[in-house]
Amino acid sequence: MAVLLLLLRALRRGPGPGPRPLWGPGPAWSPGFPARPGRGRPYMASRPPGDLAEAGGRALQSLQLRLLTPTFEGINGLLLKQHLVQNPVRLWQLLGGTFYFNTSRLKQKNKEKDKSKGKAPEEDEEERRRRERDDQMYRERLRTLLVIAVVMSLLNALSTSGGSISWNDFVHEMLAKGEVQRVQVVPESDVVEVYLHPGAVVFGRPRLALMYRMQVANIDKFEEKLRAAEDELNIEAKDRIPVSYKRTGFFGNALYSVGMTAVGLAILWYVFRLAGMTGREGGFSAFNQLKMARFTIVDGKMGKGVSFKDVAGMHEAKLEVREFVDYLKSPERFLQLGAKVPKGALLLGPPGCGKTLLAKAVATEAQVPFLAMAGPEFVEVIGGLGAARVRSLFKEARARAPCIVYIDEIDAVGKKRSTTMSGFSNTEEEQTLNQLLVEMDGMGTTDHVIVLASTNRADILDGALMRPGRLDRHVFIDLPTLQERREIFEQHLKSLKLTQSSTFYSQRLAELTPGFSGADIANICNEAALHAAREGHTSVHTLNFEYAVERVLAGTAKKSKILSKEEQKVVAFHESGHALVGWMLEHTEAVMKVSITPRTNAALGFAQMLPRDQHLFTKEQLFERMCMALGGRASEALSFNEVTSGAQDDLRKVTRIAYSMVKQFGMAPGIGPISFPEAQEGLMGIGRRPFSQGLQQMMDHEARLLVAKAYRHTEKVLQDNLDKLQALANALLEKEVINYEDIEALIGPPPHGPKKMIAPQRWIDAQREKQDLGEEETEETQQPPLGGEEPTWPK
């Protein structure tokens, strides 16, 4: 049934003689199915003539579209005739099923034609070619499967062997029941061939196989053993099983083995030729599929996707990549001046800053084919696949030129090639990189394929990849500035239902999140919306944004983690020490919030400072940062005369600042104005240092002096303000969370003047105006979060 269905759906008839198709015009060809007058087609007398003729006519007319080749027409006719004589109802079901599949495919083609309406002519032509390639591939697959199915069916039909049996099965299931007709002994193979009577019943079922093989240990005494078994079964002499011997020589066995091997190789060659393993275009073989580049095609002409106006911030980066778009749209402006557009651009920057987003915008704006592929998709465990995929990618790009090729995370294939010094190498990655270098700037390079790549690890890229002529333009996308963060916040806030306008929140949130990437900002906006929905608010409030910022910075409050009274007291004095030192010193940031609620990031409490967009730091500013970080440890020592492990992260920060001041910033008098790069660990954790062991000891000594000086200064600040430290700790134990206004009410204003806080004047004026006018917020516009009124920003 399956073979016949494949025959009907996959093959087409060519010219040449052959048996007449069974449904063609002519005389009736089978009993029980008289021919309908004037048509010569069979019909079933048990069904209504009108309905049957109409349905059968449609089915047979559809089947005529799938005409058979001369090679298999005779086989198909024989199968159909046998099937018809044995079970005509099943034949009708088969024809009806084939008609259903054919009409279903016709409907699917009509749907595809309807979908293609309204598309551009280029898109419709491209879609047509793609469908033709797919249809050709499917036809080749069906032909291959058909050949395999027919060969296996014929071999199975011609073979009468039922497999191997044991001596016990032979005696009890065949010999004792009288099913054995004769046996034939093959001495060279120690095999006995057992031939059964037609229609023999073996193991309780009728068997079509009439020959079984039996392995015998002592072939010379087989006949004697057989006669003894017949005597035990009381078989008469006239009914004894005849035994014959078949001897094959060495050359006969060799010829048989060579012939079977040749037949198998011929079948494999034929299958591989049909499948395209010989390199023919359009092949569907597994190896060809592995060699093909798995890129994503972005069509900017569809009008969908990300445009430059959707990318907030990154003004300089957008200006640089826009030149590629302008060149592809109107190259004559550049060519008439003799200018050459760069061959490629490398987008650099920290994670989450929008490198891939900018590439998506280029894909939409360029209005040319955009082939995107990730770097890790080039490398596989099979050698040579990476280079093959690079060739496949650029071959497709040159066919679609002008075109843009985008490789995301290019560091996966663009790492520096190994040298003889290292002793380690990855040949597959190096071959992939070499092929990429040749395709980007080699003998067959064209000027109409532009390469964009992105990575956040430019330091490990190979120098040949970074040189002019390949990735000759390096676009650095840094963390967004204050203005860029405000634009990014406004872009993400547009999709949220806010209590106020998006510009009402964007400025404060931008000032509250220095050092945040675009991905972090998107995460904050999403967390605020999720929190508002979880709390049942009808719009996103200020408290929701504060919760989102706090969650990103310190994690979610872990209320299930209950601290003992002693631990709560230690944490309260620890965080109060940080807050008090930061409050009393001049060059430290303002304390926004102090909490002793445990967090999911393993922190038992935190003091949230207001960070600043600052790129230059003086020695005094760095020193006071060290003092503020040591405030928790010093507060524990003064309050309890012992220290805990809670200051581990603080000590790590202090150590990093101290060594940076000594080794990189040249701020240690004993070392002088010299700078060394950060330590780079090599193989086995061993790094090469550009300074001597003696200088290392001097730098260690200077760093220890800085840390000791900062700790003494911190202790002095806390000792002079023990009452304020106690007041802050008691307030934390009572409320668990205090903010800027609470601290100012407890210990007074900062001694060096008010700290810089985020309080836009329009926010304060809006709050005062609402209080003066006595406005009442309705539930539809503003629902009080967490059962209370929405708090104002700290002043």
Swiss-Prot record:
Residues 109-133 have a biased composition (Basic and acidic residues). GO terms for molecular function: ATP binding; ATP hydrolysis activity; ATP-dependent peptidase activity; metalloendopeptidase activity; peptidase activity; unfolded protein binding; zinc ion binding. Residues 44-105 form a propeptide. Disulfide bonds: none annotated. Residues 106-144, 270-795 are mitochondrial matrix. Its EC number is 3.4.24.-, 3.6.-.-. Binds 1 zinc ion per subunit. Changing residue 583 to C: In SPG7; function impaired. Residues 701-795 are annotated as: Interaction with PPIF. InterPro entries: AAA+_ATPase, AAA_lid_3, ATP-dep_Zn_Metalloprotease, ATPase_AAA_core, FtsH, P-loop_NTPase, Pept_M41_FtsH_extracell, Peptidase_M41. Its cofactor is Zn(2+). It catalyses: ATP + H2O = ADP + phosphate + H(+). The chain crosses the membrane at residues 145-165, 249-269. Keywords: ATP-binding, Disease variant, Hereditary spastic paraplegia, Hydrolase, Membrane, Metal-binding, Metalloprotease, Mitochondrion, Mitochondrion inner membrane, Neurodegeneration, Nitration, Nucleotide-binding, Osteogenesis imperfecta, Protease, Transit peptide, Transmembrane, Transmembrane helix, Zinc. Ubiquitous. It comes from the Eukaryota. Residues 108-133, 751-795 are annotated as: Disordered. The active site is at 575. Pfam families: AAA, AAA_lid_3, FtsH_ext, Peptidase_M41. The modification 3'-nitrotyrosine is found at residue 505. Changing residue 577 to S: No loss of interaction with PPIF. Loss of proteolytic activity but no loss of interaction with PPIF. Zn(2+) binds at residues 574, 578, 650. ATP binds at residues 312, 352-357. Catalytic component of the m-AAA protease, a protease that plays a key role in proteostasis of inner mitochondrial membrane proteins, and which is essential for axonal and neuron development. SPG7 possesses both ATPase and protease activities: the ATPase activity is required to unfold substrates, threading them into the internal proteolytic cavity for hydrolysis into small peptide fragments. Forms heterooligomers with AFG3L2; the m-AAA protease is composed of heterohexamers of AFG3L2 and SPG7. Component of the mitochondrial permeability transition pore complex (mPTPC), at least composed of SPG7, VDAC1 and PPIF. Interacts with MAIP1. This is Mitochondrial inner membrane m-AAA protease component paraplegin. It comes from Homo sapiens.
